[in-house]
């Protein structure tokens, strides 16, 4: 359960609020993440199901899909995202608990993969289709040149991912044979679209608009210095 301040859990759930995986908006280092997961009793060989939401962010599965992305990036293959929230679990007549699960510490040995995230050079290379998963309004204000707008809200209904046939229609504007880079400001909400693309078999990577602008500003500053010499 990666929700913050959650009081009801699926019985036996380990509680690690998703904010513990971050330092402000930046993801912790692989070693820091391995220590966090190991202390919680998770090894890379364990089967993991992630669920939860961020109510201050408006709810929805973005934090869960983001933690799923982090785990996959660390080489954890046996991980899934619960379809729905603990409320959906309870509504189905299944039990909940107010107690968090506690497991003995284990060694989480990361096997970091670069196949799940994009670098600025890759975004600029033209190799991938660029998907802006922010709102239509944000996209209209500014975006990465050439990006296609697929708002993250379009792939979910309430707290759940839309069905496969609907997702296929939404992603119909993309070339399935070409890689995809998905971004939002920090990448958190983009992870929902990235997750949906991965489920459908796309070669997708996650990116952040923050990183794009940091690199753009650096290049502009270098160009300005060169022109003044």
Task: Give the positions of each predicted feature.
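Cytosolic catalytic domains that perform sulfur/thiol-centered chemistry
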Residues: 1-229
């Amino acid at each position: 359960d990666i929700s913050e301040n959650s009081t009801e859990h699926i019985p036996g759930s380990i509680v690690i609020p998703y904010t513990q995986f971050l330092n402000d908006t930046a993801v912790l280092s692989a070693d820091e993440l391995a220590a966090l997961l190991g202390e919680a009793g998770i090894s890379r060989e364990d089967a993991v199901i992630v669920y939860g939401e961020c109510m201050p962010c408006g709810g929805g599965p973005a934090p869960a899909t983001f933690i799923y992305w982090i785990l996959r990036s660390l080489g954890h293959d046996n991980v899934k995202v619960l379809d729905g929230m603990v409320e959906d679990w309870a509504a189905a007549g299944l039990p909940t608990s107010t107690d968090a699960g506690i497991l003995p510490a284990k060694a989480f040995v990361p096997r970091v993969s670069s196949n799940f995230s994009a670098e600025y050079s890759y975004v600029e290379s033209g190799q991938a289709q660029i998907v802006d998963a922010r709102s239509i309004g944000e996209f209209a204000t500014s975006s990465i040149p050439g990006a296609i707008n697929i708002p993250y809200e379009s792939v979910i209904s309430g707290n759940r991912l839309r069905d496969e046939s609907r997702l296929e229609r939404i992603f119909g504007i993309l070339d399935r044979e070409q890689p995809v880079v998905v971004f939002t400001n920090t990448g958190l909400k983009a992870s929902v679209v990235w997750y949906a693309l991965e489920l459908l078999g796309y070669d997708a990577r996650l990116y952040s608009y923050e990183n794009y602008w940091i690199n753009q500003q650096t290049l502009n500053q270098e160009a300005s210095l060169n022109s003044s010499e």
